[in-house]
Amino acid sequence: SVDALQEAVERAVAMAREAPEDAYAGLAPAELLMHETPRDLDIDDGGEISAEKLKDMALAAEDAARAVAGVTNSEGGSASSGRAVMALATSTGFARGYHGTSYGVSASVIAGEGTGMQRDYAYHSSRFATDLETPESIGLRAGTRAVRRLGPIKLDTQSLPVVFDPRVGGGMLSALIGAITGSSIARKTSFLLDAMGTQVFAPGIRIIDQPHRLRGLRSKPFDGEGLPTAERAIIDDGVLTGWLMDAASARQLGLTPTGHAARGVSGPPGAGTSNLHMAAGSATRADMIGSIKRGLYVTEMIGMGVNGLTGDYSRGASGFLIENGELTVPVAEVTIASNLKDMFRALVPADDLVFRYATNVPTLRIDGMTIAGA
C-alpha cells in the first residue's frame, strides 16, 4: 500500500541519519550512467510452468535417481519456475529496467547403507524452459554420481597433480574475483594487491566476463548502479587487466567505476561479475588425465578454507584416484592445499568448456598440490 511504502521510506531515511558518514558512498556519476534503451538479451521466454507440472518434474527427477541400482534413499527432487524484474531509479535521472525467466530441476540422493553411505546431486538451470534438461536425465546423473562414490579410500599425505571437474573448478574463479574487487583492494585485504598488469596466470589463459551473453544466467544490460555493462577480459594472456569496481570503491581508489556493481534490494552495492568463464585450452580431458601416473580427480569441495589476504588455500575434497591415466577408486576425506598464486600460475585448462552455470570453466589441472590424508 501507499502507507506501507511511505513508512518504509521514512524508516530508511531515519536509519541513514544515524549511520556514520562514509566519504566515498554515493550514487554513480551521472555522466557514466546508461542512457540508451537496454538491449534485448533474450532472457525471458514469456512463459511459466504450473505448480502441478513442477511437482511432476520434481518427482520424475527423484524417481529416475532412485531407480539407479545402489541408491537407497533420497533427499528429494525439486523444480522451479520464476520471473524476476529488475528496476532501478536514481535521483540523478536513471530509470531503467529489465526482466527474465529462470527454470531449474535438481535431485539429491544417497547410495549405500550405514556408515558407508554416500550422497551426490545433479541440477540444471536455464533461462528458457525449452533449454532445460529433462528431469529424468538430471535424476539419472544424480543417482549415478552417488553410486560411483561408494567404497572410498583415504590417501596418505603426498604431493600430486590435481584435476578439477568443471562443476567444482569454478571456485578458482570465485577466489580470483574476491581478490580483485575494489573494496578488497581499498581495504588492502587482497593477496593480489600489487598484481594489476602482471602475469597472474600462465600465458594464454583468458578469463572473460560476458554480461550480454544471450540467455545467460546472469546477463544484464546495466549494473547495480545504472552503468552500462560490457564484455571484459579480466585475465588476458595470463595478465590481470584491472580491478572490478562499484562507484564507492572507485572513489576510494581514485579510479573510474567499471560497471560491475552488484546489489540486492537492500544494502549498498558491492562488485561482482555476470556470466564469467575461463576460455578452453588445447588439451583434451582424456589426454590431460592420461598423462598422470598418480593423481587426484576432484568432484566435490568442502569448506571455505581460502585466505584472501595471503592466498593460502586449504579445502576438503573428494573424488577419484588417478592411476596410470585412468580414474579408478573413489577418494574421500582428504584436504588439498597450496597457495593461490602458485595454483594460478600452474593451472592448465582442457578443451571441454561447456556453458552450464553462471561461472564456467573447462576441466582444470594443477600440478604439485599437497594432498593431506589419513
What are these language model-derived features?
Residues A195-A374:
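Dual-mode signal for accessory low-complexity, basic/Gly-rich regions
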Residues S1-K220, G224-L227, D236-V239, E326, ...:
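Active-site bordering "gate/hinge" segments
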